Design a protein with these regions (language model features):
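Residues that recognize and position ribonucleotide moieties
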Residues: 2, 9, 52
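Conserved nucleotide-sugar donor-binding
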Residues: 5-21
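A conserved hydrophobic position in a structured secondary element of the catalytic/binding core
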Residues: 11, 36, 54
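Acidic donor-binding loop at a coil-to-helix junction in glycosyltransferase catalytic cores
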Residues: 21, 27-39
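Active-site donor/metal-binding and catalytic loop motifs
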Residues: 27-32, 49-70, 78-81
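Non-catalytic, C-terminal membrane-associated alpha-helical segments of glycosyltransferases
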Residues: 68-129
């Protein structure tokens, strides 16, 4: 679910119409600029919808990604994303993520950890409103 790009998703509208909606707080043009596809798929799964992966090309696009290099703002937003996806586990994910992603981040592990925790904390405040 975490490795999927929006343009790789197709679905039957009638299956999701009354069950799942995009979380508009996530995605380009919103507060948190990525993660909408991951949230959408996890929400589909949590609502009992079936998710399939087909290793078949259905479209071709230039190799572009919002996840190639994580700047400080991206790291912060990933913290919010992990809080949205895994509310009970997100705190336990911070250190492993900081270690695994340190090579694609434009900062050190201490700052990665701090930014992830800040994203988690700020998103929790939004949830509590």
């Amino acid at each position: 679910i975490l490795q999927v790009c929006s343009i790789e998703i197709t679905f039957r509208v009638l299956k999701i119409k009354d069950k799942v909606r995009f979380d508009e707080r996530f995605g380009l043009g919103s507060r948190y600029k990525s993660g909408e596809e991951n949230i959408f798929l996890l929400d589909c799964y949590n609502k009992g919808l079936k998710i399939y992966f087909y290793n078949e090309t259905i479209n071709i696009h230039p190799k572009e990604s919002t996840g190639a290099i994580w700047m400080e703002e991206d790291i912060y937003e990933k913290g919010a994303l992990f809080r949205r996806l895994y509310p009970k586990m997100c705190f336990f994910m911070v250190l492993p993520i900081a270690i695994l992603k340190r090579n694609i981040c434009k900062t050190n592990i201490f700052n990665i950890t701090k930014l992830l925790f800040k994203g988690i904390k700020d998103y929790k405040k939004e949830e509590d409103r």
